[in-house]
């Protein structure tokens, strides 16, 4: 659903407030392209910044919202698996860390309160579909595979990770479960729940909450920049 065009305002405001250069990869999307196309593109984009644009890995923060947050996490875990360079940090906005939607926040009450994601998810439930149908083939839907379900990942020796999530969104439990994994693995992290906010509220750059959230990100990047 997301694209460089759909996220132009969000990325522009975030780049301005953080004083950074942001590259938005035009990675392959489902349902036309199923997993692992997205993971392949994420790893390729990270390596291109190093090999073609002469960045060091310590200069790179991988970020993403919703499904892009999933991609950021699995890209990190794939790079760790390869034993290659890791990014300086991760910034995750309402990350889709549990594509199966097994957490406690996946319920009709929360769907009614999440004004962005709720209507779409309710249609999925009404049709008795899986949340990941447009992303995964059934043979890839292994909930123990961290390169698909990053809530099952091991984050030991990973770089600092920042998470922002709204309290009124269906994916709230994704972030909470991910936070528990980071605590378990002693991964440096900063976690923020935004009271009353819906899924990826950052898309509305005119809200004061969005500007404040972007300033949180700027502080995080300043703290951990090399």
Outline where the language-model segments fall.
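Alpha/beta-hydrolase superfamily serine-hydrolase fold, recognizing
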Residues: 1-226
